[in-house]
Amino acid sequence: MSSGDAAHMAESAASIAAASIGAVQIGEDGKPLELSALKASISEQAEHVIEKIMPRKVIRLTELYKNSKTSSHDALEVVKNGALANRGVTQLLEVLKVEILELIQYLDVLKLWVQLNIPSIQDGNNFGVSIQEEIAGMLEAGKNSGLGFLDTFTKYYATRGKLITKLNKYPNVDDYHRGIAELDEKKHLLLRHCCLDLRNNYAVLFDMITKNKDRLEKPRGLSNHISSMY
């Protein structure tokens, strides 16, 4: 490439960049309108999650926990009857998979909402900012908890598949029957625990967010009224 071509390309790139910058519209707050629109949209979504979704999820997951009881006898009967899958476990697992994916989506919205409200770094009262950072960390921890449960689902199917393969090869070995039944029972107990864990995530986060909503939206708006977030 000649120096003339390089100069021409550089000039073209500069022109494109200038055109792109020129196309950005600035709002009254001094910020690009696209970013202001994004912040407004996220705030609206976060409000819906806080006021509507989170209370409903607490009730929904509590009911799911109460309605998902089983026993070791049920799990063993599933294996003895020749079923390749434990329908009770797989149905609850699929329901919780949807619940976890929704939790992750909602917590991502709330975390972005909190982060978009964090002000510029200044000296003075940063108490509200520390609350924002604390709750953003709690939202991330809740998301990671959900992702952790998803990993256990994959491991369950892999482990059970190996046991089923051995059972088909040695159908008269009673230990394989009992091993699969024990695996199913343990998984069912963990899934019920998952119901409570998801429920508790929603409940605790809802409580913390509603108690500190003013500080989350305007962290420096209460400079003369500093108190504990708890």
Predicted regions and their residues:
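Extended, amphipathic alpha-helical segments that serve as helical scaffolds
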Residues: 68, 90-163, 167
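Charged, low-complexity, helix-prone segments enriched in Lys/Glu/Asp/Gln
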Residues: 42-61, 103, 146, 153-156, ...
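Short, charged/polar, low-complexity loop and linker segments
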Residues: 78-89, 119-132, 174-190
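N-terminal leader/presequence regions that precede the main folded/catalytic core
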Residues: 1-87
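Long all-alpha helical scaffold domains
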Residues: 75-77, 81-84, 91, 95-115, ...
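Generic structural signal of hydrophobic/aromatic residues within well-ordered alpha-helices
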Residues: 38, 49, 135, 146, ...
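Alpha-helical oligomerization segments
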Residues: 165-230
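Eukaryotic low-complexity, intrinsically disordered regulatory segments enriched in serine, proline
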Residues: 2-4, 20, 29, 37, ...
